[in-house]
């Protein structure tokens, strides 16, 4: 589409959604307002769906390129991030289904995983950005 690989069009959504969800959840945890987790929960679900698409399109691009250490590290980081986001989404959905999440304001395992995913998505974004700059010759 527009001679731009599909991966480049999809990948920005899970990056933004993951970082926004982590910020909202940490803010809700610090302020002891568990009801604020609802919006972050929705963002994490969409981020997980976007990450799954980004993983698929990224692996397709990796198959078309010669192996380079930067591309391999970026792919591994993206896969880890995507899988963690999917796990966070599933854990949060399970907690919501049990109505567990809205009654406690303790540090939940999914919050730790979500912050890890947000940091990993930033690392993945930076390595991807460097690869794009290299492809453009800058």
Per-region residue spans from a language model:
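Polytopic transmembrane helical bundles with strong interfacial aromatic enrichment
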Residues: 1-138
């Amino acid at each position: 589409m527009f001679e731009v690989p599909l991966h480049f069009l999809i990948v920005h959504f899970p990056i933004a959604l993951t970082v926004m969800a982590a910020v909202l959840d940490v803010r809700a945890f610090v302020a002891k307002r568990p009801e604020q987790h609802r919006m972050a929960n929705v963002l994490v679900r969409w981020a997980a769906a976007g990450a799954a698409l980004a993983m698929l399109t990224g692996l397709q691009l990796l198959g078309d390129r010669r192996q380079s250490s930067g591309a391999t590290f970026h792919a591994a980081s993206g896969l880890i991030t995507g899988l963690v986001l999917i796990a966070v989404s599933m854990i949060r959905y399970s907690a919501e289904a049990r109505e567990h999440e809205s009654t406690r304001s303790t540090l939940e395992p999914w919050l730790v995983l979500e912050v890890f995913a947000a940091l990993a998505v930033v690392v993945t974004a930076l390595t991807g950005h460097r690869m794009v700059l290299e492809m453009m010759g800058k």
